[in-house]
Amino acid sequence: IGAANIDTLISVDKPLEVGKTIAIKHRSIMPGGKGLNQAVGVAKLGGAVRMLASLGRDYDGHRIMDYLHENRVGTDAFLIHDNTPTGHAYIYIQENAESSISVYDGANGLLCADDLEQNQHLFDGASYCLLQTEIDQGVALHAARLAKRHGVKVILKPCVVDVLDQEWSELADILVPNRKEAGKLLPGYVTPESQIAEFSRRGYQTVIVTCGEDG
């Protein structure tokens, strides 16, 4: 359950700076969004995946649906909106693999708790529910509560937010931030080891901090 959008990937030598123009080395456009990427990743590893997301009825939305079908991701619960475009993200990637992202939510921002209630059948037979705070955190929390009600484990990828609701420590079986996200959520904790220790102290059962080019 999460965001599905079109990503514009832009390769640059160095970070953007206010008032300066930098050359783009390469540009590519492809389906993305943390929810979509998780779904496709699991499918490529041989897992059976169904996704709930919100798209616009437009070219970008059709492109995303085609991509998911090609990768054997179930889309029968997708929500299609006539008057709101599909979301779009602009990702600036440096040579060291570090990145910065600007996001237009579009239809992703319309996903709501009622949509989850009407699609609870997605939890039937599921082992894990993959969530990200790229969608509204309140909606993600509601999804996690429903997952728990159906006996489904929750994996949370925090992003975009500066604060995680305290309830996540009870709902998330596995927390997977990258080191920058972890540092933003835990000011003053700069190493993955200290971040993991602090998340554990706050009640999280299993924490995996990813480290960009360092793995």
Regions found by a protein language model. Give the residues of each.
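Beta-strand->loop->alpha-helix junctions that form or flank phosphate-binding loops
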Residues: 1, 26, 52-57, 75-86, ...
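Glycine-rich phosphate/adenosyl-contacting loop at the front of the ribokinase-like
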Residues: 1-54, 59-73
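Short beta-strand scaffold segments in enzyme catalytic cores
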Residues: 40, 88-92, 100, 215
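Conserved phosphate-binding/catalytic loop of the ribokinase/pfkB sugar-kinase fold
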Residues: 54, 76-81, 91-128, 133
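Short beta->alpha connector loops
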Residues: 57-58, 134-138, 158-162
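Active-site-proximal loop->helix
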Residues: 59-71, 89-93, 97, 115
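Conserved phosphate/ATP/ADP-binding segment of small-molecule kinases
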Residues: 144-215
